[in-house]
Regions:
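Short, well-formed alpha-helical segments that are part of the catalytic scaffolds
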Residues: 9-26
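Short beta-strand-to-loop acidic/aromatic patch adjacent to the donor-nucleotide binding site
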Residues: 77-93
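Short, well-ordered alpha-helix to beta-strand connector turns
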Residues: 27, 49, 80, 88, ...
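Catalytic-site signature of metal-activated, phosphate-bearing donor transferases
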Residues: 63-71, 93-238
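Cell-envelope/extracellular polymer assembly enzymes that use nucleotide-activated donors
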Residues: 2-4
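A conserved acidic beta->alpha catalytic loop
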Residues: 33-46, 57-59
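Conserved donor nucleotide-binding strand/loop of the catalytic core
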Residues: 46-75
Length: 238
């Protein structure tokens, strides 16, 4: 049995080294789909031992890109192998590696990990409401060759999950955390807020992404649909 790391990335040079190094202990191979990065991300990935596939596509379509990468995995994988799919700014928390290893040896087929949002400092996380317990399916077993990622109604086919749609009806939560660095700094949070509202405008379900910038563009005391007022605590207490 092999475990394949999977990443779909664009311009993640700041974080990619720690991300790839964090998942190597549980992976036999790491495959990266690079979406036209111009900051050296592909070279960094290759220097860390990952196999990089430059995007042959134009435009944003997350599910299409993930399907393409999964087909590349299938070129050498077999049914019964596993995949760990993380973003280019998410690192597997080292103390939780044994939980991932146990899950791979279990009867589960799809496992969710706790996404921990680092906020303002690397030793501090956001914990108000949705942010406290947010989990995402990221570890899955290759059960059949027709696995694919779901199509959504959101712009850019955002929010298509990190596990194939065929496995989302049987999700096992495991005590493992991914440290999310992409919201660590205010400038990045504001940039992401404007990016999401540009490619996925007027998304009422996501409350127009206002939760991302509570304490930045909106007062810290704001209470919106998914989050707020802003609450932070030490990573060590998570």
């Amino acid at each position: 049995m092999n475990v394949f790391g999977m990443l779909r990335v664009k311009n993640e040079a700041r974080w990619i080294e720690r991300v790839i190094e964090s998942i190597w202990p549980v992976c036999d191979c790491i495959f990266v789909f690079d979406d036209h990065s111009d900051d050296g991300t592909p070279d960094l990935c290759e220097s860390l031992g990952a196999v990089v596939y430059p995007s042959p596509f134009e435009g944003i379509h997350e599910a299409r890109d993930k399907d393409y990468l999964l087909q590349k995995v299938w070129e050498i994988a077999e049914a019964g192998d596993w995949c760990l799919m993380v973003d280019g700014d998410e690192a597997l928390y080292e103390p939780d590696i044994p939980a991932v290893e146990r899950a791979i040896e279990s009867a589960a087929v799809c496992c969710s990990l706790h996404i921990v949002y680092l906020w303002d400092r690397e030793d501090q996380i956001r914990v108000d409401r949705w942010y406290r317990e947010f989990r995402r399916p990221s570890l899955f077993k290759l059960t059949q060759r027709n696995l694919s990622f779901m199509r959504t109604t959101f712009g850019g086919n955002l929010h298509c999950s990190s596990a194939p749609i065929q496995l989302l009806s049987s999700i096992t939560p495991i005590p493992a955390r991914l440290l999310h660095y992409g919201y660590l700094y205010r400038n990045d949070r504001v940039r992401k807020y404007h990016f999401y509202n540009t490619i996925d405008p007027n998304n009422a379900f996501e409350d127009r992404y206002r939760h991302m910038v509570i304490g930045d563009l909106f007062p810290a005391a704001s209470a919106f649909k998914w989050a707020g007022p802003l609450e932070l605590k030490p990573l060590a207490a998570s």
